Amino acid sequence: MIFASSNRHKYEEFRRMLSDLIDLKFLEVDYLEPQGEDTREIVVTSAKWLSNYIREPFFIEDSGLFIEALNGFPGPYSSYVFKKIGNEGVLKLMNGVENRRAFFISVIALSYGRGIEVFEGRVQGTIAREVRGGGWGFDPIFIPNGSNKTYGELGDEKDRFSHRGASCRKLREFLMRFGSDRLP
């Protein structure tokens, strides 16, 4: 099966979480993602477009960080915002803000012969007051509920807590039920 993305970090996470089930191949593809407020709609539209070019089963994923005090910003624009202002910029926007509640959402679209299946993962948490740990993207500033560590401090343990881990578990259940080797 193929994971199509321009983000190798995402591929590494999915490969790690699915390695016992499928042989996941990385197709590095940079495509124009439609803009909008609905992450699910963005992913489905992108998968439909990519299915014109990729002729075997594949999946893509999009995610976003939604910060309550910022009215859901950066939301579906998370990748762009990270590239422009990074973690430090988000923390600057949150300077002096007491409400640190946020959530991460991950939406996977699996495209195969019978259509498109969508799997969503969502994790509630808070925004840290400083960058903590490594990782990539907003990992060093997001603390999932039930932990006192940021994603960046969790390392591979992040897979158990993360929004991407949650959506991947749903994809995994589908592949086990349907049979990943029988996808048309």
From Swiss-Prot:
GO terms for cellular component: cytoplasm. Its cofactor is Mg(2+). NCBIfam families: RdgB/HAM1 family non-canonical purine NTP pyrophosphatase. This is dITP/XTP pyrophosphatase. Substrate binds at residues 5-10, 63, 136-139, 158, 163-164. It is an enzyme of class 3 (hydrolase). GO terms for biological process: nucleoside triphosphate catabolic process; nucleotide metabolic process; purine nucleoside triphosphate catabolic process. The keyword Membrane does not apply. Pyrophosphatase that catalyzes the hydrolysis of nucleoside triphosphates to their monophosphate derivatives, with a high preference for the non-canonical purine nucleotides XTP (xanthosine triphosphate), dITP (deoxyinosine triphosphate) and ITP. Seems to function as a house-cleaning enzyme that removes non-canonical purine nucleotides from the nucleotide pool, thus preventing their incorporation into DNA/RNA and avoiding chromosomal lesions. It catalyses: XTP + H2O = XMP + diphosphate + H(+); dITP + H2O = dIMP + diphosphate + H(+); ITP + H2O = IMP + diphosphate + H(+). The active site is at residue 62. SUPFAM superfamilies: ITPase-like. It comes from Korarchaeum cryptofilum (strain OPF8). Homodimer. Its EC number is 3.6.1.66. Mg(2+) binds at residues 33, 62.
